Amino acid sequence: MRKKQVFNPFLPLNEYIPDGEPHVFGDRVYLYGSHDHEGGYTFCMDDYTVYSAPVDDLTDWRKERVIYEADQDPAYPELCYMYAPDVVQGNDGKYYLYYAMSGDYGVGGYTCPISVAVCDTPAGKYKFLGHVRNKDGSPMMRYVCFDPAVLNDDGVIRLYYGTQYDYEEQPDFPENDAYVKQEMEMFGRTREEILSYPDSIMGPVMLVLEDDMLTVKEEPKHIIPYKVKGTSFEAHPFFEASSMRKV
């Protein structure tokens, strides 16, 4: 029998998956995202779970499994929650999960490198692989490592991330020390680090990864202006949760 209607919400009423990232792998679409707890006191308290449906029948969703748990990350339990993730198929055919850790109410969520986990299947049990790193092996901490999105662009692995507030748009920045101190507290950086960026430590950035899915191949750079006043982005500036699609 032909189905004529798709209902929303399509997930169970006690399931909360914000920051949704749907991806088609094979003949199914997989929905990845953060995982809020019903009645929870802060963001993203539950481990990552995945739902999927046939690409030709988006009424037939099923819960796959919990694919990754916060305590698999070495930052746990100091940071015990996982924020907006993304998944990509690498050039080796494996699946790679990118995410950032955080604490209660987002505390600490801007202070750690981007974590990576790997699995042989889209909805299997992912294993911690490592952190995005510089060529010398040190953790990559350029700009604010938050809410990653990743794209396999015909074999080129592009990683997008960042967050944005308007502190540095204020006419008295950095003379008004309150703005600098706010960034120091939020991002876990020194004053010298904050002011060392010729553009800004904030804003949406992109880097290119090696095929190992961890090592930086091309250094991060802004993809749109951080300072949006007077630009075409002024009415809709970037905030967070990069989500990229190739069209």
Can you say where each PLM-predicted feature lies in the sequence?
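Carbohydrate-active catalytic/glycan-binding domains of CAZyme proteins
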Residues: 1-247
